[in-house]
Amino acid sequence: MLIPSKLSRPVRLDHTVVRERLLAKLSGANNFRLALVTSPAGYGKTTLVSQWAAGKNELGWYSLDEGDNQQERFASYLIAAIQQATGGHCSTSEAMAQKRQYASLTSLFAQLFIELAQWHRPLYLVIDDYHLITNPVIHDAMRFFLRHQPENFTLVVLSRNLPQLGIANLRVRDQLLEIGSQQLAFNHQEAKQFFDRRLSSPIEAAESSRMCDDVAGWATALQLIALSARQNHTSAHHSARRLAGINASHLSDYLVDEVLDNVDVSTRHFLLKSAILRSMNDALIVRVTGEENGQMRLEEIERQGLFLQRMDDTGEWFSYHPLFGSFLRQRCQWELAAELPEIHRAAAESWMEQGFPSEAIHHALAAGDAQMLRDILLNHAWGLFNHSELALLEESLKALPWESLLENPRLVLLQAWLMQSQHRYSEVNTLLARAEQEIKGVMDGTLHAEFNALRAQVAINDGNPEEAERLAKLALDELPLAWFYSRIVATSVHGEVLHCKGDLSQSLSLMQQTEQMARHHDVWHYALWSLIQQSEIQFAQGFLQAAWETQERAFQLIKEQHLEQLPMHEFLVRIRAQLLWAWARLDEAEASARSGIAVLSTFQPQQQLQCLTLLVQCSLARGDLDNARSQLNRLENLLGNGRYHCDWISNADKVRVIYWQLTGDKKSAANWLRHTPKPAFANNHFLQGQWRNIARAQILLGEFEPAEIVLEELNENARSLRLMSDLNCNLLLLNQLYWQSGRKNDAQRVLLDALQLANRTGFISHFVIEGEAMAQQLRQLIQLNTLPEMEQHRAQRILREINQHHRHKFAHFDEGFVERLLNHPDVPELIRTSPLTQREWQVLGLIYSGYSNEQIAGELAVAATTIKTHIRNLYQKLGVAHRQDAVQHAQQLLKMMGYGV
């Protein structure tokens, strides 16, 4: 819940001096990216900018405090301020900020700018007290903000010092409007206006100018002069002499003498007690100070000129001038030290009553009241956890004694979930084990089950599926239905374990249950995770169309719940890329993989390994070996600088081994085979994949017998577990083994099986990647004219893809090849005496590649009748009568030229 006063522009008071010369300068702020107002405390930065902002509707105001160094809090308020300025235009960014569903501040800002691209009027955002920001991550994000904000957007920053926002660069590019302390200092005319409005008796212009010079135009000093003159009934000039040459560091003594010591005891205590509040309203004042009418007291303090300012148009929220507030808090620690804990307790209670638990925690921590802090956490910690207030929770839990956590074990559970969210898996188990050992009495069964659900999640994350399954089952046996979050966790883990074990049907059922529970209770990250798992299972089962449709539901969920910047979004676009690659939609697959890399742009490069693997796959399917090699260099560098799940390693090894196959690099394959551990099982898709990599390397090295043993066992496992996509891949690799070892009949048999299974999977690129050996076999099958219609259509599609992407592999008789052929000593005499034209050579190459007449016409962009003429001419020149004769003739020419076909 956001505090309204932090998003309210200060109210312009009637007795303030209108700074016309500075307002004129600010009037051109819309021509700059950044308007920067800097000066020490008390020079009137906020007052000036609030005057300038008056009447501007499309302006957001964000007043900072120390707590805004938390990235999530900063993001929430900043987006809320822009929403106020735009009337709710940036709803997606607002939802992402509220739900903490973004990868980083920069990625959230990138989404914000996408929405602001449709906003065409001038827009302003004021950030007050930016000097309070010390978090370098926020500084980096705001530099990004300034670089990429729309042209019609102006950021206005108020700060006591020069902020770390790339100021020099903006200044050089004339994108910075600056107002500093010298310009903010009152001139003689402004000082005269100020005293005329504040003092009951006017003073001469010369005296006013002299006092202005004495304090170097410092607005706070002028205000103190007027206040002191009114309180002490002395001349303003007397106060000015005391303030001459004073600065903020020596102001405390003056404020004690001239302000605190000149108010009655009741007002003094009111000032000191209320100063602990960063912002205040009637209810807070009543509780903290004991005054009966807090609103009336606040307005009275404001009228006395005691540095209290309204924070909103309604007059409900107030705050002290930062300089005076800081002074009062320091004095409160000295003068009311014994009462201070009780004052903070009262503040915490009032904030709780108004629904601001994070502010209440701030005061409970300041009070050192562990019992109050514990009670707040017991009632509100999980809500704060779900809103990613992780830093505040961690600080709070550290402030509680261990004994208090043991007495309230759900707080131990919360601390463990905090550790899990930070991937501190070993610490989670250590903490839970210690708690179980030291909790007095019999531990509640439900709590024990919640511990086990968390342990199960840690175990599966840490690559221990057996332990994860045991713990998940224990948790589900004991958890009541009402404990929905832990049940969602345990059900999800159990489903993931069954997926790893190859029990796809049961795993799919559990993931569907997880989705239903997660949607019902608005646990959106588990709903998304379950959909991703369902899609992977359906892919493994060979139901790629069903996997596609499940992915569509996941994309819709991401859109509806604004989950675009969760790392899981990368998982989804990656498995979409895998599916698109299988269907030979290579451009879309590549775009999807690149979007996955973009999602992870703020994470460690190692996280991008899977998407990079897919980019290599796309290059290999296109036959672009140079590009594949470049991408592989980066991939292999990442492999050497990280620890990865076996699934990631299997996918990375796959593209490496295929590349070695396509380039004939037996040395690299042999070295990899020597050092690669062989998995103990092959009961899921990633273990099947790694065994397939091993078999492919063995085939490349001519080790046909061990490769055949591997593939036959893989097929047996795949059939028993219904891993139909893996079976399709295994059959294709077995086909290559039979083809290269001269067992043509066996090769044809398994190829027919693979084509039939592809009617279910839709595979195209898995065939294409095998290149010319696959093309030759498909040509022969097409020529036999015995394939069923669907298999015939798929075979022709695969041939077109091979011809398009692997044309350098003999499918095209280009000019260089023809020239070498005609100069060959064994070229048939008929071709010498009646040579083919270049177009006729092209047609012969396409016939050899399995193209029909219509497809050849489309490829060469000529009429079908023209193709028939070319075919008739080349048949006559070659002395053949049928298409199959022409294919055989082309094959003989290729063999003569030394190509192994």
Curated annotation (Swiss-Prot):
Stated regulation of activity: Activated by ATP and maltotriose, which are both required for DNA binding.
Q: Which residues form the HTH luxR-type domain?
A: 829-894
| Any one GO molecular function term | DNA binding
* Ranges of the DNA-binding region feature: 853-872
Alphabetized InterPro entries for the sequence: P-loop_NTPase, Sig_transdc_resp-reg_C-effctor, TPR-like_helical_dom_sf, TPR_MalT, Tscrpt_reg_HTH_MalT, Tscrpt_reg_LuxR_C, WH-like_DNA-bd_sf
For this UniProt record, the keywords arranged alphabetically read as follows: Activator, ATP-binding, Carbohydrate metabolism, DNA-binding, Nucleotide-binding, Transcription, Transcription regulation
Record bears the keyword Transcription: yes
Q: Does the keyword Transcription apply?
A: yes
Query: Single Gene Ontology BP term?
Result: positive regulation of DNA-templated transcription
Pfam families cross-referenced by the UniProt entry: GerE, TPR_MalT
Matching entries from Gene3D superfamilies are given as:
Tetratricopeptide repeat domain, Winged helix-like DNA-binding domain superfamily/Winged helix DNA-binding domain
Q: Where does ATP bind?
A: S39, P40, A41, G42, Y43, G44, K45, T46
The entry's family comment says: Belongs to the MalT family.
Function per UniProt? Positively regulates the transcription of the maltose regulon whose gene products are responsible for uptake and catabolism of malto-oligosaccharides. Specifically binds to the promoter region of its target genes, recognizing a short DNA motif called the MalT box.
Its assembly, as annotated, is: Monomer in solution. Oligomerizes to an active state in the presence of the positive effectors ATP and maltotriose.
What is the recorded name of this protein? HTH-type transcriptional regulator MalT
Q: Whose protein is this, by species? A: Salmonella typhimurium (strain LT2 / SGSC1412 / ATCC 700720)
What is the primary gene name for this protein?
malT
